[in-house]
Amino acid sequence: LTFDAVAALPTGEATKERPTLFKTMIGTLNHNYLIDLVWQAHLEGRDHGFQARNIVLHHDLAELWKAQQAINRWYIDWSGRQTEQSLDETVHFQFIGGDPGAMTRGDILLHVVNHATYHRGWIAEMFFQVPARNPTTDLPVYLQSLGHGSDSEPRHSG
């Protein structure tokens, strides 16, 4: 929903500098993507190679969307392979600033989801500066757009 809404904005609005930490909508979306890559590396036990959180890896929204979809698929596939035991495993890592850190795999996954949601809210707020109708960031609305909760969907018991 967010990428579609940003793509529908008038030309230049996604890259227009605004009074926000990552400067632009594209910058904020890139930050989300970069952080997804950082935590993927931590989960895989490898170095991510990033020295900053504000690097624009993809200046083009369509390219960024493709890259974001790829990392989203990785997280979906990775999540599907996890067990309660594996999600409780502690991962030791270094924050981008160099400080040591440790979190369970489950906490990392929770952080990745919450982090992206948080910054999508920043982007939605920037829409008021355009001005344009902001994309919804509510999970129930998103799930409804996917058809979740409809009578044709299988119900889970338990």
What are these regions (language model features)?
Residues 84-97:
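Carboxylate-rich helix-loop segments that flank metal/cofactor sites and access channels
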